[in-house]
């Protein structure tokens, strides 16, 4: 019988959990306090930057959410790098792309709903798309078969199922975004906000599953 695999890097695991947990708490807070301003069905998470919290903007809080998730992901990246497993470089590059994309999304706002596309808005959209593709790709590379005593092997099936769900959600969100561009916001048929929140939930669950062996 194989002995249980030791924790890869408890310090990185705790930092990752802290960052991811903070991001989740902030996202719940934004949903609760801005439910009357931003539709969770039709509007994306990024549009919380235009919400109002009392006399102030919700943009700083949204930025902190993105930065916290990015920090947690960087900690996961560092923990995986410490494992020194085959394929680590590719996984770290993809997680780096995911983390950088989150950073850009937190600093560069999306275009307001119904307004003309701006360069900043396009940068935000491209960063978000790249990030959401990079994370499940990293998960698939991390759980590639043929790696003996890999800390992530016991969770391989779960990680891959979540990564598949993430890719599927990205496809739906991207398809809905293209339809909205073609038909216009007034004729929007796909509930982008709802599917993006599903994608966010899947990706957070995926991150937490990937973090577990670090602890």
Please describe what each predicted stretch is:
Residues 64-93, 136-150:
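Internal transmembrane alpha-helix with an interfacial aromatic "cap," most often the third helix
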Residues 10-18, 84-97, 154-166:
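Interfacial segments of alpha-helical transmembrane regions
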Residues 57-62, 88-91, 116-133, 195:
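Transmembrane alpha-helix entry/boundary detector in multi-pass membrane proteins
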Residues 101-152:
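Membrane-proximal helix-loop-helix units in multi-pass membrane proteins
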Residues 48-71:
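Interfacial helix-start motif at the membrane-water boundary
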Residues 142-215:
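Terminal transmembrane helical module of multi-pass membrane proteins
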Residues 7-33:
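N-terminal signal-anchor transmembrane alpha helix
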Residues 26-36, 40, 100-115, 170-188:
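C-terminal ends of transmembrane alpha-helices
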